Amino acid sequence: MRWLDGTVTVEDSVGSSISLGGDLLRTTFLPSITTVTLGLIRMRDRSLRLGPIPLITFGPPKMSSTSVSWPIEGGLLVASAGGRFTIESAGGHLRATLDGYRPMLPRAIYEATQLRLHHGLVRVQLLRLAGLPPSQAQPSPVSRAAATAIDAAVCAGLALVFARRHRVRVFTGIAIGYHLASWSTSGTTLGGRVMRQRVASIDGSRISLIQSTLRLAALPLSALRRYPAHDDIAATTVVKDTPV
């Protein structure tokens, strides 16, 4: 990240096993924000919108054989028009660069809030487009189910110990905090440790708090669709945690 005269330049990059053309990047990257925000933010009329509110409005995109770039023209999160947002597929990497953007928020608040969300969501989108195979061997469905059962038992036990009333609410709160803390620190819960498995980004790296939050929020969708939509949305996978 670099600041210059009130404008900021931010870059995120992930390895990629495929090469993507500029037109494909144009039609997939920004629209996929709807998926990774679970419908909260949508791309419409070249604007990223939260409900009816345009957060960032872009001008017409410019494309090359390996990249697409949108000029920034306005929106609630933009202090003044200027700068560009570019996605490039080259050299075995997918790279997103926000260059010359002037945020509406003061620098300290921007760095503590919007910048963190930007890094987290952009990285998820890049990983989802990167076409990477799982970095390690994956545990069997039976092993995953056993780990889930252990974690549910742990959370239920804590709820029984610490709550005499509203145990369902307490169980829910404990389960949320337990999984978010476990996934975004070590990648593994108590059930995962017992069954020797952990959650990782699809490139093998530790998952972020944003990925953990997306994964947990999308779990009901996985149950409805009967496939791991939570891993697809958060760009995560469960891998065997082999002792060194």
Question: Model-found features: residue ranges?
Answer:
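Hydrophobic ligand-binding cavity/cleft-lining segments
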Residues: 1-65, 138-141, 145
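A conserved amphipathic terminal alpha-helix motif
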Residues: 108-135
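Membrane-interfacial and juxtamembrane segments of integral membrane proteins
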Residues: 128-244
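Hydrophobic pocket/interface hotspot
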Residues: 96, 118, 151
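Hydrophobic-ligand binding "helix-grip"
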Residues: 49-91
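A broad, low-specificity signal marking well-ordered, structured residues that form hydrophobic/aromatic
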Residues: 8, 68, 94, 197, ...
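Beta-strand/loop substructures that line and gate deep hydrophobic ligand-binding cavities in soluble
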Residues: 79-112
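Generic structural motif
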Residues: 13, 73-75, 90-92, 101-103, ...
